[in-house]
Amino acid sequence: MKFSRFVSILVLFGLLTKVQGPSLTDFLFPRRCPRFREECEHRERDLCTRDRDCQKREKCCIFSCGKKCLNPQQDICSLPKDSGYCMAYFPRWWYNKKNGTCQLFIYGGCQGNNNNFQSQSICQNACEKKSNST
């Protein structure tokens, strides 16, 4: 009798955490933001202020000159080049994993992804050193 109550409470707890908050593995193995700090040409607008501003598997991290929502389990340097859908003209750098170099592209100013750096040196420090160590 006591055991079945205990199991029912565990099942209910498991269902509620999936609906209302982080999963049990997030408590046991907390995710961390990348430890990447760089001198920036200019500070970018923060896209978040805390983890609650981000989607389920993302954290609000200081990354590439501003606060951004990142999935700590995702390799940012593996993301494809994404100019976004706006029509601004911002020269930026992205890491091309196929040839292992940072390449210039034009960012439209909104959306896109986090494989988007202000300078070639910031891109290299974030991605090339990481890929050389693996």
From Swiss-Prot:
InterPro entries: Elafin-like_sf, Kunitz_BPTI, Kunitz_BPTI_sf, Prtase_inh_Kunz-CS, Serpin_venom_toxin, WAP_dom. Residues 1-21 form the signal peptide. It is found in: Secreted. Its main location: secreted. Residues 77-127 form the BPTI/Kunitz inhibitor domain. GO terms for cellular component: acrosomal vesicle; cell surface; cytoplasm; extracellular space; protein-containing complex. Residues 102-133 are annotated as: Interaction with SEMG1. GO terms for molecular function: serine-type endopeptidase inhibitor activity. Pfam families: Kunitz_BPTI, WAP. This is Eppin. The lineage of its organism: Eukaryota, Metazoa, Chordata, Craniata, Vertebrata.
